[in-house]
Amino acid sequence: GFDQKEKTFYIWEGVTYFITEQGVNNTLNFIADHSASGSELVFDYMFKSVVDGDFSRFPFARGLFKMMSFHDQHYIFGIDPARGEAFVNERGLAVVSDIGRNEMMKRYLTQSDGTVIGRPPGFFHIVHAKVP
């Protein structure tokens, strides 16, 4: 079981954009308040502008939204990437990194010979945070 006195590594992927801001706040606050110092969290988020329906920078996102809507799935929460670090810090966690598409490709999707094996959408970020 979960022991809040022991360091924990949380992987919270594919969730934040499907729940409310209050749900995100509650989860981040719970982790900050009930986890041992040094515990870590990795989660992804979608840009608030895209969730709000602004597809001007990422036109293909419109198709993704239509497909998800067809399957009765709706994106409801996003974070402004310019405020990503502040958003997480305000909820009691310390950001280690908040990376976008290019850094994701460099770190995780480039083989040793330089071949890129995937291109994530530009409107997602991955955050790595720690409990101070």
Model regions: which residues?
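Alpha-helical subdomain
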Residues: 1-132
